């Protein structure tokens, strides 16, 4: 097992940032810690790194109890959101820094640096300074520097948070390919649901210092364990079980709070025995997808997402009368509002 967190808690004054967390991360996996601000994800990452010490519990890295080890003793690579590169050093010198501190032989340092420059697709830029690089390139240098010392665990704290959307998306795909090459046990913190789902092997959803659910992206999305997970992972309509849209459906609704994904709202132009009447109140064109805001006859607002092809079939317009039904939905006894 790469990382084991056993009943770990951490408190700052009266605020309990991490509350009795238990977590196992297999060696070689790429795992996302996902949650809103204040959920404890960054504190948990710092506890694994040794930058914070737990009040209770143990941290086990590659089979050894690391709870009382220093950061240096843990053999961890750490990448922050804002790069933390040395401005007065070239790209090559930044990558070599950790190896030189450890007094590695010069020929080994040179070979490792060139290998990493190629790995992070920065060959030819080794003599540039950080100020001469784009944000995406600087983050690649930070990752190369973290990998230079061949860490047993790589920790990334919102590594793409300071970048614009296009660069962030490109780097996500690149990080996934990089991980598939190096196979280092990697944990990264993010509040971006799409980022977590796209990049990771497993997602750890956190809320108020606790782990709500651990699973693959598909498991987290398709089988959420709690109303919080359902609400936090992707868009959702939250409706009472008494809503008109469920009255004629064949779905089994067990609890009073029903969660309906926009893509699971079926829109028809004519009524049948399982549909409810609704009015189109707003259309939002995103190019690849159309968002449709609907108002049911009972006043409930429901959002639907349509593919471009389905939208072209329906030819919807504002104020148009349509008929809707749920394709799938989940209900929970309690509703946690984010």
UniProtKB/Swiss-Prot annotation:
SMART domains for this protein: AAA (SM00382)
Classification via SUPFAM superfamilies: MOP-like (SSF50331), P-loop containing nucleoside triphosphate hydrolases (SSF52540)
Keywords per UniProt: ATP-binding, Cell inner membrane, Cell membrane, Membrane, Nucleotide-binding, Sulfate transport, Translocase, Transport
GO molecular function, one term: ATP hydrolysis activity
Role of this protein: Part of the ABC transporter complex CysAWTP involved in sulfate/thiosulfate import. Responsible for energy coupling to the transport system.
PROSITE patterns: ABC_TRANSPORTER_1, ABC_TRANSPORTER_2, CYSA
Its membrane topology: Peripheral membrane protein
EC category: translocase
Source species: Nostoc sp. (strain PCC 7120 / SAG 25.82 / UTEX 2576)
Residue ranges constituting the ABC transporter domain according to the UniProt record: 3-233
Subunit structure: The complex is composed of two ATP-binding proteins (CysA), two transmembrane proteins (CysT and CysW) and a solute-binding protein (CysP).
Enzyme Commission (EC) number: 7.3.2.3
Reaction equations catalysed: sulfate(out) + ATP + H2O = sulfate(in) + ADP + phosphate + H(+); thiosulfate(out) + ATP + H2O = thiosulfate(in) + ADP + phosphate + H(+)
The protein, known as: Sulfate/thiosulfate import ATP-binding protein CysA
Entry's family note: Belongs to the ABC transporter superfamily. Sulfate/tungstate importer (TC 3.A.1.6) family.
Organism domain of life: Bacteria
Localization terms from the record: Cell inner membrane
GO CC terms, sorted: ATP-binding cassette (ABC) transporter complex
Binding site for ATP: 35-42
InterPro entries: AAA+_ATPase, ABC_SmlMolc_Importer, ABC_transporter-like_ATP-bd, ABC_transporter-like_CS, Mo/tungstate-bd_C_term_dom, P-loop_NTPase, Sulph_transpt1, Transp-assoc_OB_typ1
């Amino acid at each position: 097992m790469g990382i084991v967190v056993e009943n770990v808690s951490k408190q700052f004054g009266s605020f309990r940032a991490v509350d009795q967390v238990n977590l196992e991360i297999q060696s070689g996996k790429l795992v996302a810690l996902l949650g809103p601000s204040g959920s404890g994800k960054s504190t948990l990452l710092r506890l694994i790194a040794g930058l914070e010490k737990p009040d209770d519990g143990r941290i086990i890295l590659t089979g050894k109890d690391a709870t009382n080890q220093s950061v240096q003793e843990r053999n961890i690579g750490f990448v922050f959101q804002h790069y933390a590169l040395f401005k007065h050093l070239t790209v090559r010198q930044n990558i070599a820094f950790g190896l030189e501190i450890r007094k590695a032989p010069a020929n080994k340092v040179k070979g490792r640096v060139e290998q990493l420059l190629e790995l992070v697709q920065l060959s030819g830029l080794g003599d540039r300074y950080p100020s001469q690089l784009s944000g995406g390139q600087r983050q690649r240098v930070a990752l190369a520097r973290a990998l230079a010392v061949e860490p047993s665990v790589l920790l990334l704290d919102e590594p793409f948070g300071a970048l614009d959307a296009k660069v962030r998306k490109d780097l996500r795909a690149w990080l996934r390919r990089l991980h598939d090459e190096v196979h280092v046990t990697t944990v990264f913190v993010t509040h971006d649901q799409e980022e977590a789902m796209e990049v990771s092997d497993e997602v750890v959803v956190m809320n108020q210092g606790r782990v709500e659910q651990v699973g693959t992206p598909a498991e987290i999305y398709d089988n959420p364990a709690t109303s919080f997970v359902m609400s936090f992972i992707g868009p959702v309509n939250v409706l009472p079980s008494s809503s008109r849209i469920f009255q004629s459906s064949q779905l089994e609704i067990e609890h009073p709070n029903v969660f309906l994904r926009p893509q699971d709202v079926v829109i028809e132009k004519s009524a049948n025995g399982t549909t409810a009447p609704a009015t189109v109140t707003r259309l939002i064109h995103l190019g690849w997808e159309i968002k449709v805001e609907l108002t049911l006859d009972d006043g409930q607002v429901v959002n639907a997402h349509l593919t471009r092809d389905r939208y072209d079939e329906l030819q919807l317009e504002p104020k148009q009368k349509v008929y809707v039904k749920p394709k799938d939905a989940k209900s929970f006894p309690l509703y946690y509002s984010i």
